C-alpha cells in the first residue's frame, strides 16, 4: 500500500480536503519508493487527531506535532496547521525543492518551488538562500542525497561555499550529525558522503579524523598503490557496500584503519601496532559521536582484528579459534570477513571461518571435557586446556 492509499485509511473521508502529504513522503511517492515514515500537514483540531489515534508531542508550539506509530509501517507525523494558508509557509521553510512538495489526498500535487523539475533530473536545489543558515545540518543532508546519485546544482554548491560553517555547527548536537552520517551509509554510494565533506571542507568539528586521512599514507606503496588513507577507506567502503547494505558493516569498513592516525609521521609509511591503537581510539571516537554501544564494540574489535583477518590463512589454529571467539563475543562474526575481503580483495579470504566460530562457541561439554576433570585442574591451566580441545575439534571437523 502506497502512502496516499494508507493515509486515506487513517482519516474519515470528510476531513480529507484538510490534509496534505508533504516533504520527503511526496518525493518518495513520486519516485515510486517506499519511505520509512509519512509526514502530513493538516488543519485538524486536537479532538479530530486524537479520535484518529494520534497523540500530541509538543502542544505548546505554534504548529503542534502529532504522532502515530503503525506496526509494520512506521511513524506517521502530522504538523497541525491553524489554517490552510500555513501550508505555503511550511513549504518555503523546507530544505530543498524536492522536499518542498505537497499532495492532497485526491492526488493533486502542490509544487510552489518547482520541485518536480529537480526531482526528474535528480538535482538538489535549496528552497531559499537562507536554507543552510536556518539549519546548517542541512548541508550534511545534501551530502546524503549525493550518496543516492543526486547532484548539487551550482547555486546550492555556492551557498555551501559561501562561508565557514564550523562556528554554527559547533552549537548543534553531534547526535544530529551522526544520524545523517549513519543514514548516508545506507546509500548506494556511501563514500560520497565523506568525499563531499572533504570537497566542501565542512564538518571538521564532528570528524577531525576524516580530514587528517588524506595526509596519511595508507601503507607502503607496493601494498597500497592507492596512496593515502582516505582513498583507501573509500575503496574499501565501496567494495563492502557492494557486498552488504548493512550500515554497521559499512561504518566499520570505512574507519577500520583509525589506528593509523596515531602513527608518528617519522614512521610513515608503516603503521606498526595500528590495530591495537585503533582499538582504544575507536571507543573514544564512537563516544564523541554519541554512537551506540554496538557501534563502539564493533569498530573497536574490527580495528584490532582486521590485520590478522587479512592473513587468516597463515594463522595458527589456536589464533584462529581465539579470533573467532573474540569476534563472536563482539558481535562482528559477519562483519569481519567482509572487511577483510574489502581490505585485501586479492587475499582477504577466510576459509572455514564459520567452522571456527562454531567451535569457539562450543561448551566444555560439547568439546568432550568432563566437569570433574576441569574442576580438578589448576585454574591457570583451564583456559589453555579448553582451547586445545577446541583446536582438536576444529581440526577434526576439517
Per-segment meaning from a language model:
Residues 1-398:
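Catalytic cores of the polymerase beta-like nucleotidyltransferase superfamily
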